[in-house]
């Protein structure tokens, strides 16, 4: 209820009020759609509030897990919550230079993945990279010709300030470019529904 005290556009306030007034069945429907990566285009606003709540809850739960106990579940699946990655990042910190980590949009967990492998199907064949800017861009789309999906990849080795979830939204132009090219997004970010 504290969120109602925040300034927001009227449409957002109406969506928040609808979520707060929703009965248990409707809230379960919202949460099921968010957790299933299946947000209907005609009701994105209330789903965004539900997604924000899910992110906070999952991040709190993941923070309580013993990192050493986490084991790979499958390619492109978060070992903490089972969610899909929003993005992946090639790191540039000492000891993990040029190592790739996938970033979960649900719980914010980052986990190591093979650098040149599709996070959607696991293929190492037919991977390509596109960007809005230049070949030296720090945000690119890694697309797979095998499965027809793409996931955003950040080169934090070149730009350490990149954030895996916030800059996913901040690089919306790349989503538009890939959508217009007919390639399906493989990573999931509830704040980019429709792209």
State each model region's role.
Residues 1-66:
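N-terminal alpha-helical interaction blocks
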Residues 153, 190-195:
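Juxtamembrane/interfacial segments around transmembrane helices
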Residues 174-192:
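C-terminal membrane-proximal segments flanking the terminal transmembrane helix
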Residues 56, 60-179:
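Cys/His-clustered metal-coordination modules, chiefly Zn-binding fingers
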């Amino acid at each position: 209820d504290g969120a109602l005290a925040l300034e927001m556009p009227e449409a957002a306030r109406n969506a928040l009020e609808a979520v707060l007034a929703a009965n248990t069945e409707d809230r379960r429907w919202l949460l099921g759609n968010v957790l299933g990566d299946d947000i209907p285009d005609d009701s994105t606003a209330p789903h965004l509030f539900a997604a924000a709540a899910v992110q906070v809850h999952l991040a709190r739960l993941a923070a309580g897990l013993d990192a050493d106990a986490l084991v790979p579940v499958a390619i492109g699946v978060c070992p903490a919550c089972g969610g899909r990655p929003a993005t992946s990042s090639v790191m540039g910190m000492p000891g993990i230079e040029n190592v790739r980590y996938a970033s979960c949009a649900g719980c914010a967990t980052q986990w190591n993945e093979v650098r040149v492998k599709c996070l959607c199907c696991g293929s190492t064949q037919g991977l390509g990279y596109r960007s809005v800017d230049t070949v030296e861009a720090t945000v690119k789309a890694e697309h797979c010709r095998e499965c027809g999906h793409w996931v955003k990849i950040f080169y934090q080795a070149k730009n350490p300030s990149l954030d895996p979830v916030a800059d996913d939204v901040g690089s919306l132009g790349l989503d538009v470019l890939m959508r217009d090219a007919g390639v399906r997004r493989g990573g999931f970010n509830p704040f980019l529904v429709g792209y």
